[in-house]
Swiss-Prot record:
This is Serine/threonine-protein phosphatase 2A 56 kDa regulatory subunit delta isoform. It comes from Oryctolagus cuniculus (Rabbit). Residues 36-45 have a biased composition (Low complexity). Belongs to the phosphatase 2A regulatory subunit B56 family. Residues 1-80 are annotated as: Disordered. GO terms for molecular function: protein phosphatase activator activity. Sequence repeats lie at residues 21-22, 23-24, 25-26, 27-28, 29-30, 31-32, 33-34, 35-36. The modification Phosphothreonine is found at residue 47. It is found in: Nucleus. PP2A consists of a common heterodimeric core enzyme, composed of a 36 kDa catalytic subunit (subunit C) and a 65 kDa constant regulatory subunit (PR65 or subunit A), that associates with a variety of regulatory subunits. Proteins that associate with the core dimer include three families of regulatory subunits B (the R2/B/PR55/B55, R3/B''/PR72/PR130/PR59 and R5/B'/B56 families), the 48 kDa variable regulatory subunit, viral proteins, and cell signaling molecules. Interacts with the PP2A A subunit PPP2R1A. Interacts with SGO1. Interacts with ADCY8.
Amino acid sequence: MSPSPSSSGKDGGGENAEEAQPQPQPQPQPQPQSQPPSSNKRPSNSTPPPTQLSKIKYSGGPQIVKKERRQSSSRFNLSKNRELQKLPALKDSPTQEREELFIQKLRQCCVLFDFVSDPLSDLKFKEVKRAGLNEMVEYITHSRDVVTEAIYPEAVTMFSVNLFRTLPPSSNPTGAEFDPEEDEPTLEAAWPHLQLVYEFFLRFLESPDFQPNIAKKYIDQKFVLALLDLFDSEDPRERDFLKTILHRIYGKFLGLRAYIRRQINHIFYRFIYETEHHNGIAELLEILGSIINGFALPLKEEHKMFLIRVLLPLHKVKSLSVYHPQLAYCVVQFLEKESSLTEPVIVGLLKFWPKTHSPKEVMFLNELEEILDVIEPSEFSKVMEPLFRQLAKCVSSPHFQVAERALYYWNNEYIMSLISDNAARVLPIMFPALYRNSKSHWNKTIHGLIYNALKLFMEMNQKLFDDCTQQYKAEKQKGRFRMKEREEMWQKIEELARLNPQYPMFRAPPPLPPVYSMETETPTAEDIQLLKRTVETEAVQMLKDIKKEKVLLRRKSELPQDVYTIKALEAHKRAEEFLTASQEAL
């Protein structure tokens, strides 16, 4: 197969030299009822969904303001001499002296200040450093021929001194107690300086004067490893910058690509099998989404193993909700690249299917529908039986959101076209669950959705529908016959036991009255006719009453808000937006 149009072939490793930038994109909206024509699959997004900066959601009601807490910080090695002298402005200095002045400012910005134990100390010198960083950001953005060979080691050193540090222990609980949607992130106290350092380095990488052949002496494997360690920072603003910087490095340094992928794999393995706690999984998956989008065809065995051994096991971690949109995007990208991977992916999802975690089950159903939107009919026929056995269990779930999400599959025209082509194998699997729950499910909304699904099946193949109804009736009769045989057998055993002389000594207390299910009778011919009439009327009513795009939300508790944290996250401007705005201004 030839490479896809997006694959340039510049990279010996099979990826583009420049993959699609992880530009901010709106989150995927719920699947609308009206789909493209049934012969067409839904096109996927070209960029991965961006990671949310703030995952804390409030369900309304009065706000409870929590007292602001001092934000803990990373462990910096503070400089002993922190007295900075204000240097002349770069734009006002003679051209021949600017390179030396630029280097002086870079070295001056290697001085580290205390923002935690004594935030009011050295205010004058902190302002000198902040102003110097701001000036260098503007200088490298709007000037040309300023990134000379002498600047590379100084810029990388300044970045390393300011950013590479020991991260503090997590302030939030780990394991089952950790709730990423409610536990507030710990913001970096030194952010006024760190933000400008990140902005400068990003502009440095994006500069037209930047030459990877020179920079590779300084941006090496050791640098990348230290950069990846920072992805565990609790501050989402920092992870947002790191994501963009690592993606730019991946695009510009071809020799580091395999190493970056390998180290990301190691982070994932440690997360899955050891710690189950890492703050940057969503951002790393967002980067990988763009990388996978640029893979050349046919896919290498290394990339297929990454899908099976890393991406699929990521589904079993407790904190899946934090990174699931990015993970689902990566999986779908692989299937669009190579449809033969569909069977192992769906089998893997069914293997990791949640047993007792209903919100997680809804996430799996969302992802499964995205996969079915891009599946080839030949691949669908390989997996439809185990797939619909699982869907039948979901339809029977007492958790109404799980049942509801599964039944929404019948509003997807492409999925319905696949079912129609394989109705003889799908309907016998689904009919018992649909019929049983049309009578017994506690939620009336589910009744309407079930009647809609039954109506579609009935219109699809009336004879097959009648056959399934008769088969279900026969199975119920067989079940009643087996139950009667079992009762008779126990009665015989009890009669034999009564013949024993010691029977009165060991006689059991009278049995409890039998427990009847909500559906004990075998469906009669009248029941079947009533079912058909009910399906027609209820399905029409359901289409009127139920919204086609219903967002499934997990209801959160009312927690005190940290006003400082909320304001800081709202004020943060994403790195890509910052770059786009500056480039348009040029």
